[in-house]
């Protein structure tokens, strides 16, 4: 047999078993590719997670820094508001409230706890003001008073001697002797003027001292009597001498500019002179419900008129209403110290039934009790028998009202 005859009976090896070797090769290749793709996919997923976490961290850091800046700006705004409202020391205010809360609320009629030393310090303020007006020099020695009066007596004696020397005592006096006498009298007058100048210097020192009202009035009467004597003597010598004229002028200007000082401890009202202007000052000690006109229904404040005799004949007071007996221009002032939890407090000064002055305070804080004062004042022309009274804007507002306190008061004096 030849090859050609055997060719139909021979089949290729790849065609046996339905192509099994080719299928196995493709499956292995696919598995190999799948195994290679799994790490790549996992790597991409991990990289994405890292990028997301990094982005989230950056965003969170930026957000925190922005919030920190906003917090700092808010703190600055709060600090500025505290400075404007004057509440930088809230802790100290809280301590003050804890210390005086019971005294201000539970015992409203208890006398204010001011010691005698504090009262003396208040009186010292008047003396210090008077001393400052006189070049800030204080003279408190009583011996200088006696020395000043001795100098004044010596000056009067010299004036009498000078007047006697200028009066002719003998009809036989020659003209030459007359010229000698006139020259000597002129020299004496010069000495008298120097002595009077030194007396004025001592007198200014004496005016700086604190004296009682009775001593000042007695001294003023003595000076007026001496002033009359000096005026008569200077008028007799005016035609021949030049020194008495300026002496009389200095004396008149000195008496014109005299002013009275108040001794420590005396009331301003009791220390006034006879020609002083009427004045009255009240410490607000109580209140009562009052229904007024014009829609004002607040409580009326009543003052403690312990100085009744000081303004008798000028003012009349009854149930918190002050009546003026003399027509004129008056200065009215008032202050109330509030201690409550309200944000707004205030009062009105009425002229009759018409509001004249108004005071309103706003304290927007979170403190349980807010202690603050409200003060107002002004000028007003009042006719005879016109009335002035003080009334709160609201009802039942807790205020510091006690006998002898210096926080709530009301006053008036004639200008």
Curated annotation (Swiss-Prot):
Q: Where is the composition biased (Low complexity)?
A: 164-173, 181-196
What spans are recorded as compositionally biased (Acidic residues)?
A: 114-137
Basic and acidic residues compositional bias, start-end = 209-220
Residues the UniProt record annotates as site (Cleavage): 145-146
- Membrane topology, Cytoplasmic segments: 1-37
Give the region (Disordered) as residue ranges. 111-143, 159-256
Q: Where, in residue ranges, is this chain on the Extracellular side?
A: 59-415
**What PTM annotation applies here?**
N-glycosylated.
Where does the entry say this protein is expressed, by tissue? Expressed in the fat body. Expression progressively increases with age in gut progenitor cells. Expressed in tumor associated hemocytes.
Bilayer-crossing regions: 38-58
Q: Secreted as a keyword?
A: yes
List all disulphide bridges recorded for this chain: 359-374
| Induction of expression | By gamma-radiation. By bacterial infection in the gut. By aging.
Key words, A-Z = Apoptosis, Cell membrane, Coiled coil, Cytokine, Cytoplasmic vesicle, Disulfide bond, Glycoprotein, Immunity, Innate immunity, Membrane, Secreted, Signal-anchor, Transmembrane, Transmembrane helix, Tumor suppressor
Per UniProt, residues of the THD domain are 278-415
Query: SMART domains, from UniProt?
Result: TNF
Q: What is the effect of changing residue 397 to A?
A: Abolishes binding to grnd
The free-text function statement in the UniProt record for this protein reads: Cytokine which acts as a ligand for wgn. Also acts as a ligand for grnd. Induces apoptosis by triggering JNK signaling. Together with grnd, involved in egr-dependent apoptosis in wing imaginal discs during development. Required for JNK-dependent non-autonomous apoptosis through release from apoptotic cells and activation of apoptosis in neighboring cells. Required for JNK-independent damage-induced apoptosis in the embryonic central nervous system through regulation of the pro-apoptotic gene hid. Involved in the innate immune response to extracellular pathogens.
Extract the PANTHER family matched here: A PROLIFERATION-INDUCING LIGAND-LIKE PROTEIN-RELATED, PROTEIN EIGER
**Name by which UniProt lists this protein:** Tumor necrosis factor family member eiger
Q: Which organism is it from?
A: Drosophila melanogaster
């Amino acid at each position: 047999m030849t090859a050609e005859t055997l060719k139909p009976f021979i089949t290729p090896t790849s065609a046996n078993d339905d192509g099994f070797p080719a299928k196995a090769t493709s499956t292995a290749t696919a598995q190999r590719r799948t195994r290679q793709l799994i790490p790549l996919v996992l790597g991409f997923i991990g990289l994405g997670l890292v990028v997301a976490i990094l982005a989230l961290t950056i965003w969170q850091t930026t957000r925190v820094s922005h919030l920190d800046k906003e917090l700092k700006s808010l703190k600055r705004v709060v600090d500025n508001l505290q400075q404007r409202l004057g509440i930088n020391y809230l802790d100290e205010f809280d301590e003050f409230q804890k210390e005086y809360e019971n005294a201000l609320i539970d015992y409203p009629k208890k006398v204010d706890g001011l010691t005698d030393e504090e009262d003396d310090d208040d009186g010292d303020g008047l003396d210090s003001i008077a001393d400052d007006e006189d070049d800030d020099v204080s003279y408190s020695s009583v011996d200088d008073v006696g020395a000043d009066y001795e100098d004044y007596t010596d000056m009067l004696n010299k004036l009498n001697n000078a007047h006697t020397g200028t009066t002719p005592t003998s009809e036989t006096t020659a003209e030459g002797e007359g010229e000698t006498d006139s020259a000597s009298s002129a020299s004496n007058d010069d000495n008298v003027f120097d002595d009077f100048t030194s007396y004025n210097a001592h007198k200014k020192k004496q005016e700086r001292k604190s004296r009682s009202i009775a001593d000042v009035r007695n001294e003023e009467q003595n000076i007026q009597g001496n002033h009359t004597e000096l005026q008569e003597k200077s008028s007799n010598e005016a035609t021949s001498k030049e020194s008495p004229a300026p002496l009389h002028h200095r004396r008149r200007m000195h008496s014109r500019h005299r002013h009275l000082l108040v001794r420590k401890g005396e009331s301003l009202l009791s220390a006034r002179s006879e020609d002083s202007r009427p004045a009255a000052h009240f410490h607000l000690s109580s209140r009562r419900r009052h229904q007024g006109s014009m829609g004002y229904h607040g409580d009326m404040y009543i003052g403690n008129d312990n100085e009744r005799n000081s303004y008798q004949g000028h003012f009349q007071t009854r149930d918190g209403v002050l009546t003026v007996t003399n027509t004129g221009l008056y200065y009215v002032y008032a202050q109330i110290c509030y201690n409550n939890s309200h944000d707004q407090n205030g009062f009105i000064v009425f002229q009759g039934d018409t509001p004249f002055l108004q005071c309103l305070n706003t304290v927007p804080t979170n403190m349980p009790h807010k202690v603050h004062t409200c003060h107002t004042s002004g000028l007003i022309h009042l006719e005879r028998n016109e009335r002035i009274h003080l009334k709160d804007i609201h009802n039942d507002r807790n205020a510091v009202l006690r006998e002898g306190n210096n926080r709530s008061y009301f006053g008036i004096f004639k200008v």
